UniProtKB/Swiss-Prot annotation:
This is Chloroperoxidase. Glycans are attached at residues 33, 114, 237, 259-260, 262-263, 269, 271-273, 296, 304, 314. Changing residue 50 to H: Retains most of the chlorination, peroxidation, epoxidation, and catalase activities. The keyword Flavoprotein does not apply. Belongs to the chloroperoxidase family. One of its GO terms (molecular function) is metal ion binding. Its cofactor is heme b; Mn(2+). Residues 322-373 form a propeptide. Catalyzes peroxidative halogenations involved in the biosynthesis of clardariomycin (2,2-dichloro-1,3-cyclo-pentenedione). The enzyme also has potent catalase activity and in the absence of halide ion, acts as a peroxidase similar to plant peroxidases. It catalyses: RH + Cl(-) + H2O2 = RCl + 2 H2O.
Length: 373
């Protein structure tokens, strides 16, 4: 029954799961009692500029609405449902909560207000993403911006084009993908906007190898190869490719694996180098570091687009989102910091709100500094 669903897996019995049919989808997926099916986000759900967080939300491993998510819930979800140890996500979580406090203007404590605020540009979100457009990519005026939060098929295709015709890719391929994305963003962004975020993207490269390298290959731990169909399905659907034979790596990947893969990507020789590369794009990069309010963070409006889900029929029968209901509301449920509903046209009010929050934070920081002198 499932021979067509699992074409790349020789023996399903080798997996630590049985195979189950997802209700109403025609899709089989490895199943244990902790595995939940994909449910498309609705127009009022909050989603991040991050396919990992969005996949966890779409499967209900963190709150499906993408709001009020505790640090412990995030840690458990990555560990239990992605096979990613806490050591890997510690820095990213720290930065997420810093951005949460920055955007909302108050300490978020142990609960991330929502996923959407992570799209604040040049913070947790960054330029030259593998699958998102930059905040000011292709705009005509300095005050214009576009959706930098949702998956963008055209952008992701520029990543896939580098490895066209392959079933797997290695460190050198990933280095070429990385350089391609930097080059295109550098060319297409509004002049003066592009900021190279090499340390963050390096960690993301290692994360991709940690999550979707092909564990069916005998040398996967030492020389991992990313299975492209797994990567494509995960990013495009923001869902886990269970039906393609994927399951969370076991034992869970630790930070040592991710940093080793990241370093190997940067050290790998490439066969071609795109033009328009920013200075320092090639070669070793600096470490990713915790964000701080001491850094020059600037408040920006965030896009109010409805959450993405794949609807492209060319993706074929394995696309779980083809039957998902389309967003019909013209209201953005959030405004920065994503707590109140406003019309999508009400940008002036949103700008005023962001500015008032920034001014209040600046005053509080100045007062605190004066007290400490």
């Amino acid at each position: 029954m499932f021979s067509k669903v699992l074409p790349f897996v020789g023996a399903v019995a080798a997996l630590p799961h049985s195979v189950r049919q997802e209700p109403g989808s025609g899709i089989g997926y490895p199943y244990d009692n902790n595995t939940l099916p994909y449910v498309a986000p609705g127009p009022t759900d909050s989603r991040a500029p991050c396919p990992a967080l969005n996949a966890l939300a779409n499967h209900g491993y963190i709150p499906h609405d993408g709001r009020a998510i505790s640090r412990e819930t995030l840690q458990n979800a990555f560990l239990n449902h992605m096979g990613i140890a806490n050591s890997v996500i510690e820095l990213a979580l720290t930065n997420a909560f810093v951005v949460c406090e920055y955007v909302t203007g108050s300490d978020c404590g142990d609960s991330l207000v929502n996923l959407t605020l992570l799209a604040e540009p040049h913070a947790f979100e960054h330029d030259h993403s593998f699958s998102r457009k930059d905040y000011k990519q292709g705009v005509a005026n300095s005050n214009d911006f576009i959706d930098n939060r949702n998956f963008d098929a055209e952008t992701f295709q520029t990543s896939l084009d580098v490895v066209a015709g392959k079933t797997h890719f290695d460190y050198a391929d990933m280095n070429e993908i990385r350089l391609q994305r930097e080059s295109l963003s550098n060319e297409l962004d509004f002049p003066g906007w592009f900021t190279e975020s090499k340390p963050i993207q390096n960690v993301e490269s290692g994360f991709i190898f940690a999550l979707v390298s092909d564990f069916n290959l005998p040398d996967n731990d030492e020389n991992p190869l990313v299975r492209i169909d797994w990567w494509k399905y995960w990013f495009t659907n923001e869902s886990f490719p269970y039906h393609l034979g994927w399951h969370p790596p076991s034992p869970a990947r630790e930070i040592e694996f991710v940093t080793s893969a990241s370093s190997a990507v940067l050290a790998a020789s490439v066969t071609s180098t795109p033009s328009s590369l920013p200075s320092g794009a090639i070669g070793p990069g600096a470490e990713a570091v915790p964000l701080s309010f001491a850094s020059t963070m600037t408040p920006f409006l965030l896009a109010t687009n409805a959450p993405y889900y794949a609807q492209d029929p060319t993706l074929g029968p394995n696309d779980k989102r083809e039957a998902a209901p389309a967003a019909t509301t013209s209201m953005a449920v959030f405004k920065n910091p994503y707590l109140e509903a406003i019309g999508t046209q009400d940008i002036k009010n949103q700008q005023a709100y962001v500015s008032s929050k920034a001014a209040a934070m600046a005053s509080a920081m100045a007062a605190n500094k004066a007290r400490n002198l």
